Amino acid sequence: MGAMAPRTLLLLLAAALAPTQTRAGPHSMRYFETAVSRPGLEEPRYISVGYVDNKEFVRFDSDAENPRYEPRAPWMEQEGPEYWERETQKAKGQEQWFRVSLRNLLGYYNQSAGGSHTLQQMSGCDLGSDWRLLRGYLQFAYEGRDYIALNEDLKTWTAADMAAQITRRKWEQSGAAEHYKAYLEGECVEWLHRYLKNGNATLLRTDSPKAHVTHHPRSKGEVTLRCWALGFYPADITLTWQLNGEELTQDMELVETRPAGDGTFQKWASVVVPLGKEQNYTCRVYHEGLPEPLTLRWEPPPSTDSYMVIVAVLGVLGAMAIIGAVVAFVMKRRRNTGGKGGDYALAPGSQSSEMSLRDCKA
């Protein structure tokens, strides 16, 4: 099972990627599945994508030349042919289920079959620090909007509208919740254990964040301080701004944790402060890759005058060091020659240069 993602999948992605991980737990597995009907074509396009700890590890696309489940993470290549054949057959079964479901939904909503319609499913499970089931998920969306979802008790359903009530009644009569509950509590957990074991070098690693604060002028005597955390893994991280030691939860702008594209994540949090009061504000960074939380302030660059003074001092010190070295060398030569000038032989090929210099009189 799995998913793709045109813009309509953002609804499910936001819900599914919200839980983050620590190495002891929790860990997560998600499958996103999307079927899109196409005018003039009997079969919808079906795409399934699997994620472990927010990392893609398998994919199926019915429009591929040879539709099969394929590995999307190096550690999945250790699975044998029987695994891929079994998962491919499951995906093809799901493809047919989605085709029938799309047709039913057209009737529920009194829609024409001539347009393009989208049905999506997100399913998966989270493990706690004891590696037991923390929560199971099963959610459906139609045309990019919530349709029906299995509640956290894994026994009851929440239907989003009148059409979804039809599906809810059918599934209650057939005992669908019991079927999904058994999968989420059993097979989902067992496979997640297996994937975490196979991919432990990648999935169970810890990369500590690299953090810094940037300064952005605003109008009316204000500036924005932005605290950045880059290159961290896993995705679970906390950034907070403090004013004189007190947290500014209400006045802080915080973006969602984002993939960096290299297997790590990035995040920032900003706060607007009065110009000249920047040093009263500190950013705190909490991540399991850090031995202790980081505390950062904005570090103003040195002024031009200070910079010139530093350069001048360094220049004087450098010149003094060179002069000292020359004097020491000359004194040593004089001691070695009894106080007389040393014999300096010209380097080969330097005769003409020496003659021309000697003939240049004032």
UniProtKB/Swiss-Prot annotation:
Region (Alpha-2): 115-206
Signal peptide: 1-24
Region Alpha-3: start-end pairs: 207-298
Residues exposed to the Cytoplasmic side: 332-362
Disulphide-bonded residues: 125-188, 227-283
Modifications made to the protein after synthesis: Polyubiquitinated in case of infection by murid herpesvirus 4, by the viral E3 ligase K3 (mK3). This modification causes the protein to be targeted for rapid degradation by the endoplasmic reticulum-associated degradation (ERAD) system. Ubiquitination occurs on lysine, as well as serine and threonine residues present in the cytoplasmic tail. Serine and threonine residues are subject to ubiquitination via ester bonds instead of the usual isopeptide linkage.
Segments forming domain Ig-like C1-type: 209-297
Region (Connecting peptide): 299-309
One of the protein's GO biological processes: antigen processing and presentation of endogenous peptide antigen via MHC class I via ER pathway, TAP-dependent
Region of interest: Disordered: 340-362
Principal localisation: membrane
Record note on what altering residue 170 to R does: In K-less, no effect on ubiquitination
Keywords noted in UniProt: Disulfide bond, Glycoprotein, Immunity, Membrane, MHC I, Phosphoprotein, Signal, Transmembrane, Transmembrane helix, Ubl conjugation
Glycosylation sites: 110, 200, 280
List of residues that carry Phosphoserine: 353, 356
GO CC term (a single one): MHC class I protein complex
Pfam families assigned to the protein according to its UniProt record, in alphabetical order: C1-set, MHC_I, MHC_I_C
Stated consequence of mutating residue 210 to R: In K-less, no effect on ubiquitination
Glycyl serine ester (Ser-Gly) (interchain with G-Cter in ubiquitin) cross-link site: 353
PROSITE patterns assigned to the protein according to its UniProt record, in alphabetical order: IG_LIKE, IG_MHC
Region annotation Alpha-1: where it falls in the sequence: 25-114
Localisation: Membrane
Protein purpose: Involved in the presentation of foreign antigens to the immune system.
Name of this chain's protein: H-2 class I histocompatibility antigen, D-B alpha chain
Species assigned in the record: Mus musculus (Mouse)
Higher taxonomy: Eukaryota, Metazoa, Chordata, Craniata, Vertebrata
